[in-house]
Swiss-Prot record:
One annotated GO biological process: proton motive force-driven plasma membrane ATP synthesis
Protein's job: Key component of the proton channel; it plays a direct role in the translocation of protons across the membrane.
Protein name: ATP synthase subunit a
Keywords in alphabetical order: ATP synthesis, Cell membrane, CF(0), Hydrogen ion transport, Ion transport, Membrane, Transmembrane, Transmembrane helix, Transport
Segments traversing the membrane: 17-37, 76-96, 113-133, 179-201, 211-230
Membrane topology classification: Multi-pass membrane protein
Subcellular location(s) per record: Cell membrane
Subunit: F-type ATPases have 2 components, CF(1) - the catalytic core - and CF(0) - the membrane proton channel. CF(1) has five subunits: alpha(3), beta(3), gamma(1), delta(1), epsilon(1). CF(0) has three main subunits: a(1), b(2) and c(9-12). The alpha and beta chains form an alternating ring which encloses part of the gamma chain. CF(1) is attached to CF(0) by a central stalk formed by the gamma and epsilon chains, while a peripheral stalk is formed by the delta and b chains.
Protein family per UniProt: Belongs to the ATPase A chain family.
Gene of this entry: atpB
Amino acid sequence: MGGDALTFKLFGLTFNTTNIVSGLIIYAIVFFTLYGMSRKIQMKPTGAQNVFEWLVDFTNGIVRSQMPASEQGHYSFFAFVLFVFIFFANQFGLIFQFHWNGAEVLRSPTADPVVTLTLSLMVMVLAFAAGVAHNGLGGYLKGYTKPFTLMLPVNIIEDFANFLTLGLRIFGNIFAGELLMSLIANMAFSHGILTIIPGLFLELAWQGFSVFIGSIQAYVFVTLTTVYISRKISE
């Protein structure tokens, strides 16, 4: 971390070049990684196919644990893609941090609240759409008055709070991780050999911990996604 993101203007709107470039690279990494894992499917899986099948089983397990059986097939693929994308997005900044003229060119997209809140908004809109499709518009809106009418404002506030916490939780963890990693790197080069060696060990230790945190955050995000969708369907 450190420095502002690169931006450009188009039709009077400001676009974040850093997030766009980083996101496109992650899309490519995810696509080619999954394509390589699944290109030669065998009855007896080995190597990359084992990892691929484990990922599918893992995300299917999340969906099965939270959603009714009749709806699981509709959201299994979405949960799989969402988990893999967020996992790679969380780890991206640990490897690819690039600055140019004091501005960040590459970083983890999930270290930007705009990206994480956009993902959160996408999830909430999907949950609302699923609720309307399953219960009808009238039945869905009636769910806001349960268990009694006075709960209407509380239920509305709960949805807004879910939207904020889903996005800001992952942003806070990834941003803090990359910020501390930058601080450790600056400390390592502050006093020559006296700080380089301990700084190197600290950096490696923190990177390992950040991989763990990034994985947990991807899991939490997908789990809460299935929880929110399941609740809207059942209301």
